[in-house]
Every structure is written in C-alpha cells, then in structure tokens.
C-alpha cells in the first residue's frame, strides 16, 4: 500500500480542512484535482462566504478565480507554485525526499510519517482499501496546525 500511495500522480478528492492558529480555528471543504505537477486545482466549497474561489495551477502560472464575483487574476511564473501543503502529492514528494520518512501499520491503518523542512506530516491510510483517510500537519511544537479529512478520493493513476 505504501508503494501504491507513493506512485499516485493523478487524483480527485473532496477534503475537510481545519486550520488552527493560536487564536482560532477555520474549517473549509475543498475539492482538489491533481493531474501532475503542471496541472492541478483547488475549489472552495465551504464556507459560503468564499465558496467558488478556485486556485488553478497551469504550468508555471497560477490563476485565481471567484465565480461568485466573476473575478479572475493570473500570476505568471509564480515562484511558490509548488508550495501547497494541503495536497496529497505534496505529502508524497516530502515523503520521498525526507530523510526521516517512515511507515507503520496499526489498528487497520497504514501510518506514513515524514518530517521535512520543519513540518511533520502524518498520513493515515485504510489498510484494506488503500485510500487516504486523514492527514495531520504539525507545527514546530508538535501541535496539529492543519487537519485534513479525506471524504471522497478517486485515484486516476
């Protein structure tokens, strides 16, 4: 299953994301499509006040769209284009490049963990289906800063 996860390069998923800071916590529902490093997108489904916001990566360009306000912005040669901790392939790349990447099986789950660039990421996978269930991204103090719950996952590769 670990090799299966590490070979994913195209998928669609619907995730619940909780981002925690010192003072508050924000929750989002996001639809992600990933078709390789050059073609991926995220669309906010909830909360309603930012629903319809899309972040689309096309090659080295980043396009932001807000369908509710009929706005589009394009950023060419955007240098932080691949810096997206929320997507599954970001975890996969960090796992492959991380010196302290490891996995274990516990209670019917495969738990993959990596610690790269001061970010500890833990991915929990159902051992029977091979589908990701949740990911935790911890800050320097080992507190969960981002919690991602995979609601729907469709792997294309």
Language-model regions: role of each:
Residues 1-38, 157:
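N-terminal leader/targeting segments and the immediate start of mature chains
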Residues 8-10, 33-40, 56-61, 106-107, ...:
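Short, solvent-exposed coil/turn segments at beta-strand boundaries
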Residues 17-21, 34-38, 46-48, 127, ...:
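Beta-strand elements of well-folded, non-transmembrane domains
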Residues 24-30, 51-57, 117-119, 144-147:
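Amphipathic hydrophobic-ligand
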Residues 34-86:
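An acidic-aromatic
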Residues 66-118:
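Non-cytosolic head/periplasmic domains of membrane-anchored proteins
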Residues 102-157:
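Gly/Pro-enriched, hydrophobic low-complexity segments
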């Amino acid at each position: 299953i670990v090799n299966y996860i590490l070979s994913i390069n195209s998928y669609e998923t619907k995730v619940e994301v909780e981002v925690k800071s010192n003072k508050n916590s924000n929750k989002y529902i996001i639809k992600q499509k990933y078709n390789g490093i050059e073609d991926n997108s995220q669309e906010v489904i909830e909360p309603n006040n930012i629903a319809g916001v899309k972040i689309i990566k096309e090659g080295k360009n980043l396009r932001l769209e807000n369908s509710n306000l009929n706005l589009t912005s394009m950023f060419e040669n955007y240098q932080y284009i691949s810096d997206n901790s929320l997507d599954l392939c970001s975890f996969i790349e960090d796992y492959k490049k991380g010196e302290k990447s490891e996995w274990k099986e516990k209670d019917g789950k495969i738990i993959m963990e990596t610690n790269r660039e001061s970010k500890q990421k833990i991915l929990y996978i159902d051992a029977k289906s091979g589908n990701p269930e949740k990911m935790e991204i911890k800050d320097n103090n080992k507190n969960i800063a981002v919690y991602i719950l995979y609601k729907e996952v469709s792997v294309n590769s």
